[in-house]
Regions:
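Conserved, mostly hydrophobic/aromatic
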Residues: 6, 16, 34, 41, ...
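Short, acidic/polar
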Residues: 28-42, 96-115, 135, 158-164
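Feature marks short, surface-exposed loop/turn motifs that line or immediately flank catalytic pockets
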Residues: 20-23, 55, 88-90, 125-128, ...
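Conserved residues at the C-terminal ends of beta-strands
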Residues: 17, 52, 122-125, 155, ...
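Beta/alpha (TIM)-barrel catalytic core signal, keyed to glycine-rich beta->alpha loops juxtaposed to Asp/Glu
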Residues: 127-211
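Alpha-helical scaffolding within the catalytic cores
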Residues: 1-4, 67-70, 106-107, 160, ...
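Structural motif corresponding to the early beta-alpha repeats
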Residues: 55, 75-98, 125
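N-terminal binding-site loop/beta-alpha segment at the start of enzyme catalytic domains
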Residues: 1-80
Length: 211
């Protein structure tokens, strides 16, 4: 499979989004099937796998999807780019505290479930207006310097937030909704990312099965 660069990361041209192994697209498959599917994708050349801490089996518990992915890729972890995402609730944010500790707590839990000691690409799953993006970006930079993550990204974000974040710590990738029937990214996100050398990782490129 062809390779592409996302910042300092080399990824396969096609990545595997793993959310459907936990929820979102009909009946949740058996774990054994999910693991086999992920490993088969790797056998065919896929070296870019995407998950999130919030992907849970029918919302039973946080981290279900990360656990599946961690088990599946353990044997070839060093050969792939592994992306996951965190969600920070308003209740977790203390304006007088250090948001870094919140990020580190989430990341540590994700790494445990993923059976790894680093994450290649760590996204903020959704921007929370109650939490300044500048503080998130600064903390992501610290995680990069400490070697806990190799790059960071934003998911479903607009240019105003992306630009503020990128000024603090260069953003590796943006993961926004994009397909032949959902093309808003072409207006502002794509031009900004091209100008600033930020990778774009579309989610739902087949419009959740419509295409």
């Amino acid at each position: 499979m062809k390779k592409r660069k996302i910042g300092n990361l080399t990824v396969s041209e096609i990545g595997m989004g793993c959310m459907g192994f936990s929820h979102g697209y009909g009946k949740v498959p058996e774990t054994s099937y999910s693991i086999a599917a992920i490993r088969a994708a790797h056998d065919y050349g896929c070296a870019f796998f995407d998950t999130a801490e919030t992907y849970g089996r029918e919302q039973f518990y946080r981290g279900h999807n990360e656990e599946i992915v961690g088990r599946a890729v353990e044997g070839f972890r060093k050969d792939i780019v592994l992306a996951t995402k965190l969600h920070i609730s308003t209740e977790e944010y203390d304006p007088e505290g250090d948001i870094y500790n919140v990020l580190l707590r989430h990341l540590t839990a994700s790494m445990r479930r993923l059976r790894t000691d680093y994450v290649d690409l760590y996204y903020l799953h959704r921007f929370n207006e109650a939490i300044p993006i500048e503080k998130i970006a600064e903390s992501m930079g610290r995680l990069i310097r400490e070697g806990k993550i190799r790059g960071w990204g934003l998911s479903q974000v607009d240019v105003s937030i992306l630009s503020k974040a990128h000024e603090i710590t260069p953003v590796t990738a943006v993961q926004n909704l994009y397909s032949m029937v959902e093309r808003d990214c072409e207006k502002e996100i794509f031009p900004y990312c091209i100008e600033h050398h930020i990778g774009v990782v579309p989610f739902s490129p087949l419009a959740s099965g419509l295409l």
